[in-house]
Amino acid sequence: MSAASRRTLLGICLVVGGSFTVLASFNYVLTPMLTDLDLSQSQASLALSIPPIASLLVVFLAGGLGDRRGHRTVMLWMSVAFIVGSLIVSIAQGLLAVVIGLLIEGIAATAIQIIGIGLLSDRFSEPRARAAAFGTFGMVSPFVWLCLPVLTGWIVGEASWRWVPLMWATIGAVMLVATLALLPRPTSTRPVGEVATPILAGATVAAAVQWLNRVGDEGLLAPISLASLVATLALGAICTVLVRRLPSPAFSLAPLRVGRARSLLAVVVIIPLINTVFLMTMAFQYLYGLTVLQTALVMVPAQAAAVLGTRLIAAPMMRRIGVTQTASVLFAVLSVAMLSVFFVTPTSPLWVPILYVTIYNLLTVAASITVTSAVLTSAPDVNSGQLSAYRGSAQSLGAVLAVVVMNGAVFTLGRLFMSSELQANGLTQEEAAAEAAQIQASATSPDVMSQYAVPLPSGVETSQVMADSIATGLHVNGVLGALLALACVFLVRVGRRQSLSA
């Protein structure tokens, strides 16, 4: 790899890595921020759902802008926007300013990630250099998640929460300098062209995500769910009509016409669907009574393993056996590893779930970066910006499906198990249902288990039944995750066959 290539890779890692910082640290600043601004949890949940949805509006526009106006130029604009959004949050006196700041920052971060991955694919096309570049780039996200939660927890514990968005703004300044100093200037630029179709495509994805959210919260036939579905279909129809009628639309459905691209994008959707890290963080708090900061600390081995895994496992494997075989092997091993969740029980020592989530994170992140590399070469006639945008949209859909499908399945089966166990220990069906509903409504703090130490008629404590139901939920996630990992193996192999037969 030449000095210029190394400089470009460093710049991409710094700028894209900086864009992850808000997402990696925001949960740790949320509680003190709500207290300071005198906001309710419901207000915050409603308002803070807007920025990630709105960020999807620019996902396809960003891919096109990078290819037309130059990756460096657009990343420069977005770094400035990232700083502005962070500063607005730091001086916010109410919810509106927080939402506006996070909205600007979220749009900027989304655009930077889409454009940065597209630039990475364009600059590193030779297989060995590409494997090394993507292996290095794959270290960035887990490294940010390794450092930022602990750093944010320390800042919030020692000073005002407003220092955290000031930290984001400082990181944004580093991103700005890295863009100017390290990324190559565009050799040519083209007019932006029409922007209606990429914005409508992003709006369609955003509406679809909102529909899935509403289905999860309100139910499939709730009026707001049906309204979201109608909006999704209407936006999709308008976008399709414009794509067909405009002489040169900026948005294209070309990636979806390529079999290998479709298969790999399906894998991108499935990866976040497994959602084991989120469920394990809940288990650390409710099974082991850890605080949020303690949970961040016990997750350090998992993030450190992911950092090393992409560089020391994924990159060498991609060089030696190719992207497809690497992804297949990693997902196959992940499928087996997911079944080790049965070693995680209410009585298992803390190191058991730490080891489990560490192995999971290592394999998942290594497989993810391998699939990302494959997606960006899955449709040779489509530019990397569009493919990167499709990947970002697929990832967003997967994250929402994780809440609607995986969390729904885990929590539903966990509640059924808990209700059954409560009845088995002496409660009537009505009493068990009422107790389960009360527990669900109050389960908002790490010490919730101690609130239910009252023995049941059988003599077993309610907290023990709760612990067993949480462990059952983890086991459900492990089995479903193993099946989803096998589905990824199948889709990767199908995509390979479609590529060879094309």
Enumerate the predicted regions with their spans:
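Membrane-helix boundary and inter-helical linker elements of multi-pass secondary transporters
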Residues: 36-37, 42, 67-68, 90-93, ...
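Helix-loop-helix hairpins in multi-pass membrane proteins, especially solute transporters
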Residues: 52, 56-197
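Hydrophobic/small/kink-forming positions within alpha-helical transmembrane segments
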Residues: 53-57, 87, 142-147, 202, ...
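Hydrophobic transmembrane architecture of multi-pass small-molecule transporters
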Residues: 395-494, 502
